[in-house]
Each structure stands twice: as C-alpha cells, then as structure tokens.
Amino acid sequence: AVRLTNEYIGSLPSRKGKKEEYIIRNYDVGTDTISHVFTVAMPGDKGMVNLMLENNAKFSDKEQLALNIWGQMLRNRLFAIVREQESATYGVNVEANSITFPYRKATMMIGFETQRDKVERMKEMIYKELDRSQHELFTQEELTPILVSIKLSRSQAEENIGIDYWMNVLNTYAEYGEDVTDHSDKLLEGMTVEDVRDVVWKFLKKVKVRDWVIKSEEADPLSDWEK
C-alpha cells in the first residue's frame, strides 16, 4: 500500500485547493434501553422481533474480528434453539458490525419473525443466550467451522482481486495510516474461544439496547356476515 501510494497517487499533479469543512452529526439517543411494541394492521399472525445492541467503546482490530465471529456463532446457536428446538421461526438473522468513522460504534443486530404469542418466550431465550455468551466459553467445535469458512471466503476473494480492492486499501491507508493487507490472516490464525468471550464481555458490559417488536392485530373471530 505504501509503495502504491508513493508511486501512483503521490505522482499525480496537485494544486492547492480549498480545505473542505464538514460537521459530523451523531443522532444516537443517550437512553440505555428503549423498548416498544407496535401493533399494526397486517395479514397473518405475526410477531417481528428486532434487537439492536450498541457499544461506543474502542475495539482493536482483533476485537472487531472476534465480534464478527461471535455474531456467527450466536446465529448458529439461536437457529438451533429458536427454529430447530422451538419451531418458532424459519430463521434468525444475526449480524455483528463495527465502524470507526464518522464515529465509533459496534453493533449486534438480531431479528426474526414468529407468531404473536411466541414473541416474549423467544426474546427470553435470546437474552439468555446473550448472557450465556458473556459468562461461558463457546466450544472449539463452534469456533473452528467459522474460522475455516472465513479463510475459504478470503481465499476465494483473493483470486478475484480487482481495482476496487486496491482502491479501498489505498483509501484506508490514506485516511487512517493502516495497511489492511498486513495482519488480518495473523489475527485469524491466533483467534481463540477466550478471545471471543473477552470481547463479548467488553461489548455487553456497557451496552445500549434497542428492543422493537411489531405485532399484527389479532384477527376478529366474527366474519363480515356475522357482524
């Protein structure tokens, strides 16, 4: 990245221009927990659950990777519980993410659709698994397939590296001074279940919870001709 920057970007003619000023606006709400149930008119017996956990702490590159891995392991656990054991939904969406610009934030999003009367029980199970993630280690059997999958995805991506990839590398180096091609494989090789548990503990220690539920209105048992 350094060589490419010096040889190509650095060799482009430049001119003194106007320094752009901008304001970063963060619309986050300071309240730790926001929970609400919306009842709306829509067909079917539906209860849509959307949980978002947010933490504004600083996470290292290794911790960000561990956070992503935790999201994948949690997805597998919740799928086994909510779908396979409880038959309460077709699937569970779990996504962990972190950003450093325009402001720092790590998030964990969990969403699924079930029946109205199963919403609270399924939510209890999810919160129980979040707490379990914080206090108990995942097993190596849960971690290994995810590490293999990430390595395979990266290997396949490297076979199709194009200009977009290198532009992203150069942009990251220019903005943050980081060479993202250097260390990701090393972080992956050294990842342990203890690393995952540690980042879960850090993330959940001071987390904001956004708990939204959308339920369909209960159907009127009387048909139109009976009213």
Segments from the language model and where they lie:
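M16 family metallopeptidases and their MPP-like homologs
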Residues: 45-66, 70, 83-190, 208-215
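In a subset of proteins, long, contiguous C-terminal domains/tails are tracked
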Residues: 189-227
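His/Glu-based metal-binding/catalytic segments typifying zinc-dependent metallopeptidases
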Residues: 17-77
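Glycine-centered hinge/linker elements that transmit conformational signals in sensory
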Residues: 4-18
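Generic recognition of flexible, low-complexity loop/linker segments
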Residues: 37-39, 80, 95-98, 184-186, ...
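Short helix/loop capping segments that flank catalytic or ligand/cofactor-binding pockets
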Residues: 1, 59-62, 222-223
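C-terminal, active-site-flanking charged/polar segments
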Residues: 10-14, 75, 130-132
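Non-catalytic, conformational "gating/processing" segments within enzyme and secreted inhibitor domains
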Residues: 1-7, 208-209
